[in-house]
């Protein structure tokens, strides 16, 4: 399944362009914590309306800056509130993803906090199995307890470019692999191979 992910870095007509390229799904940036405040992506509403109008399934991602458990819970509440207020409380078909790549979340004590935030959101969303983690291959290996990740079967969306295979999937088939971001197309547009939930 050909899935792209987009944010306010992309031009206003990007959804139409991706549909023309054969997109089968799109993951939209919901927001990011900026200057300590959870903030809605400036093009989210436009893009989600475009995707719905195109009849494509979509997911959402949130770029975390959480420095501690309180930060994760503030972000979780923001995500929950936006899904309720903007999406009518309907969980996106292609999932809800914690984007783990910014400095504050690159720390040795991040995993228990991220795990507990996801488990809390699962309890809010009727035991949802579509709340997952997006990160680079190196991040999963350095900061995530892979044994627990497999135990909880939290969905995995891994970024790894320039390889002939998804190395995390090959090395850890026990994980719940959902997607592989395999290229940025020269930093113009992220593209993913979607395995599904």
Task: Write out the residue ranges for each language-model feature.
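Functionally critical loop-and-helix segments that line ligand-binding/catalytic clefts
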Residues: 1-8, 16-20, 24, 145-197
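Substrate-binding cleft of extracellular glycoside hydrolase catalytic domains
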Residues: 1-123
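Flexible, glycine-rich phosphate/dinucleotide-binding loops
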Residues: 35, 67, 140, 165, ...
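Detector for Asparagine
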Residues: 49, 80, 85, 126-127, ...
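Structural detector of well-ordered beta-strand residues that form the stable sheet scaffold
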Residues: 59-61, 132, 157, 180
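Catalytic domains of cell-wall/extracellular-matrix polysaccharide-remodeling enzymes
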Residues: 92-170
């Amino acid at each position: 399944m050909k899935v792209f992910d987009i944010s306010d870095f992309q031009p206003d007509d990007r959804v139409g362009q991706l549909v023309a390229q054969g997109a089968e799904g799109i993951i939209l940036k919901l927001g990011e914590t900026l200057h300590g405040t959870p903030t809605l992506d400036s093009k989210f509403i436009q893009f989600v309306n475009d995707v719905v109008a195109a009849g494509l399934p979509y997911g959402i991602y949130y770029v975390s800056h959480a420095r501690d458990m309180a930060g994760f819970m503030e972000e979780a509440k923001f995500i929950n509130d936006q899904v309720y207020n903007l999406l009518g409380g309907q969980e996106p078909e292609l999932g809800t993803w914690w984007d783990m790549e910014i400095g504050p979340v690159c720390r040795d004590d991040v995993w228990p906090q991220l795990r507990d935030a996801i488990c809390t959101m699962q309890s809010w969303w009727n035991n949802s199995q579509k709340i997952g983690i997006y990160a680079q291959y190196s991040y999963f290996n350095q900061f995530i307890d892979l044994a627990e990740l497999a135990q909880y079967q939290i969905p995995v969306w891994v970024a790894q470019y320039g390889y002939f295979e998804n190395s995390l999937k090959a090395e850890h088939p026990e994980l719940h692999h959902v997607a592989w971001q395999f290229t940025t197309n020269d930093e113009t547009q992220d593209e993913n191979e979607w395995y599904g939930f």
